Amino acid sequence: QSDNPGFNWWLKAIDEVITKAVKTNTPLTVIKPDPAKHKAEMPTMLTTTWGQQMPYNKLLPNTAKGRLLTGCVATATAQVLNYFKYPLRGIGSHTLYYPANDTNGDAIEANFGNTVYDWANMKDDYRGNYTDQEANAVATLMLHCGVASEMQYGGPNEGSGAFMKDCAEGLRTYFGFSEAEHLVRADYSSNEWMDIVFGELSSGHPLIYGGVSPGSMGQDAGHAFVLDGYNKDGLVSVNWGWNGEVNGYYKIDL
């Protein structure tokens, strides 16, 4: 266990897979990339080790429960947008509130069309020193990614959450990623799913990936992170969006 909810989801999921394999006496395998279709391996694409607290949440309201967290969907989305350094500016505007849907609460507004994203001043790693300009550059992007994905914001103890379908919609509507799609793992076999994953990664497209823990509530229920490469053995590079903690290669055909 760690305090990283995305990694904890993976631990629970792999535990279920191993338990089932033992019960059914089934060998545990990892699906490997098909060299006829995909690159044999794809080196890790992301160089960022971003998280959800300062300076990433610097521009979010500071409430009685503490400063609101960016949310894992926003952190994952921001890291992918930063990888592409795109767009230069967004489209339109949108406003959310904290508490969610309470128009008398704190307004969290993103004016996408009037914002030029300061890609040049976004650091890969904010665990050391950084300037106000570097902090504001990444905090603006994080706020916009949250608002675009209809984030339900919460403080440090409750967490912030959003649905993956809203993330895809936000990428299309506010950031101009017209081909962004929301795919559901249950609609595909393991081989079909990993063929999609390897295909996108092999093409240089990091994936915003979501996991849901059955029976969990609150911050531990759903998690978003980034898949950004794979090795020849079929293990996939995961950036958990937790300040670089436990980033590495994992079996994700779960």
Predicted regions and their residues:
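Short secondary-structure boundary/capping segments
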Residues: 87, 226-227, 245, 252-254
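Catalytic Cys-His active-site segments of thiol-dependent hydrolases/isopeptidases
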Residues: 1, 233-253
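Active-site-proximal structural scaffolding
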Residues: 65, 70-74, 163-164, 190, ...
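Short, solvent-exposed coil/turn linker segments
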Residues: 118, 163, 184, 245-253
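Active-site-adjacent structural segments surrounding the nucleophilic cysteine of cysteine proteases
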Residues: 2-160, 231
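Active-site-adjacent substructure of cysteine-protease-like catalytic cores
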Residues: 169, 173-239
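Predominant activation on well-ordered alpha-helical scaffold segments within soluble catalytic domains
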Residues: 78-81, 168, 172
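Subunit-assembly interface segments of extracellular/virion macromolecular structures
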Residues: 88, 161-170, 176
